[in-house]
Amino acid sequence: MGKIKELQTSLANKIAAGEVVERPSSVVKELLENAIDAGATEISIEVEESGVQSIRVVDNGSGIEAEDLGLVFHRHATSKLDQDEDLFHIRTLGFRGEALASISSVAKVTLKTCTDNANGNEIYVENGEILNHKPAKAKKGTDILVESLFYNTPARLKYIKSLYTELGKITDIVNRMAMSHPDIRIALISDGKTMLSTNGSGRTNEVMAEIYGMKVARDLVHISGDTSDYHIEGFVAKPEHSRSNKHYISIFINGRYIKNFMLNKAILEGYHTLLTIGRFPICYINIEMDPILVDVNVHPTKLEVRLSKEEQLYQLIVSKIQEAFKDRILIPKNNLDYVPKKNKVLYSFEQQKIEFEQRQNTENNQEKTFSSEESNSKSFMAENQNDEIVIKEDSYNPFVTKTSESLITDDESSGYNNTREKDEDYFKKQQEILQEMDQTFDSNEDASVQNYENKASDDYYDVNDIKGTKSKDPKRRIPYMEIVGQVHGTYIIAQNEFGMYMIDQHAAQERIKYEYFRDKIGEVTNEVQDLLIPLTFHFSKDEQLVIDQYKNELQQVGIMLEHFGGHDYIVSSYPVWFPKDEVEEIIKDMIELILEEKKVDIKKLREDVAIMMSCKKSIKANHYLQKHEMSDLIDQLREAEDPFTCPHGRPIIINFSKYELEKLFKRVM
């Protein structure tokens, strides 16, 4: 008798659910995608106990026809595909017809739906079987309630992480969906508390303001670009808002959130030396393309995709991000609230509550005076962050909204705040601020520094003109400043009417020398300096194999390496621009780069060598400078293409505004 037999439908569905429904957030994702595909303009997501107890998604979409209800919970039953060719033209978020079948096999599901000019229907499914189907009162659209998730798969339920982790995952999904569909009003409610509420205005920057807060939203830079195959649109945050992980990078293809290593790499290359090693930007990029250029059917959750002409898209993203920051003033403001990571404390719920109440009482008793723009911004933030729990460093979950800042996605329990209901005044203030911000984005100007840039642009001086003739050179983004002195032989102190500046002298000279060496390495010429005594290098046999393979690439950066017999190689000349006292060390370091990488990317090699040389040749800390030397250094920095960060991404200049200084000394409150 044969041993192979076809599995029962209920068992097959449970197995399939293991791929589709990993956790509560998977259910939210699938139901939210269905609502969007149904053409909904309003979607409400309500969860209890982070979705473990219940998940309810209500939309005003097209609804489900009565005759289709019998098929809705069948595997591979869908209205989105019909023929094989349809797989190459997918524009909907869902298409496999697996979601409802998988969900209903591991949860108890109640679905109410109604289409135009039709009576409503209700259907109840448990363990994959329809137990009840009856007429019911229902508004146009679909109302689906998922209860007791994983009730019949206790092993899966056992490995659910903390409720705060699960709620963080749900918030992540909903926020990303809200960003990619700003024309849909989306609300997320957890245990009766509003976590997110978007207005459906169609403006992505408004959604990002709701998620990240106005401070980040005002420092977003709009990007847009086209090729014959791709159109990209999005916002990238200024480098000062970088984070410690990649979770703040949101990439969408035709409205679908995806993860792609090469596109992440393109974004980081676009920022290039503006980011410190180990830091990642906040950004949102939506890519519109013909569906035939992307295969979305390669991953159970459809997060990973395969792209055609990936290199073309890569270069488009890099170029548009670089253009976005090319002529901008990127001097970071001092963060007065910064606390070192080692001092980070996750307070208990009661401690947080007491701290907040004390802070609130103090703020209520203080008399504050701001400009009209600052007043509007702080009004918005006061309403939007009224019960914020203070954790002064990045927490794991990137998409904790400003109305739910307390969510921690580690397995640590931490209370989360109660949010006040948003009243009409709040929405009015929010709308005014965001409309003003949107107008600024439309003009492709950065809202947070527009006034500063306008003022500062009138105060750029030509270093050769002491009388202060204005310079129109767009490269000159460092404002004129008066040197005051030096701290610890490391930081230059300067001032102007905008406040005080601190300049890291090592980072400043490192940037200057980096651009010099980068240009020189990129212009390899026949101008060489002969050595009276050739430099000799000794390599093992395996190292020789690598070096022989990449000798031509070394020649492209000016190193003529010749085999001298046995394990020895010689260099008898070197490019004239090499610092004479470091020729041997530079050549040795360049060869070591090749031996370490076991491959050569000429662009990267030139980059690495330029960074290495600039770092070694720059002023070190505890090196005291004369005032004229400091002034000369600032003048040279003013001529740099990217004068705000060193090649490693560390800031060169930090600005303390006059207001911030007065606040430090309690001159203003």
From Swiss-Prot:
Keywords: DNA damage, DNA repair. Residues 357-379 are annotated as: Disordered. The keyword DNA damage applies. The keyword DNA repair applies. Residues 361-379 have a biased composition (Polar residues). Belongs to the DNA mismatch repair MutL/HexB family. This is DNA mismatch repair protein MutL. The gene is mutL.
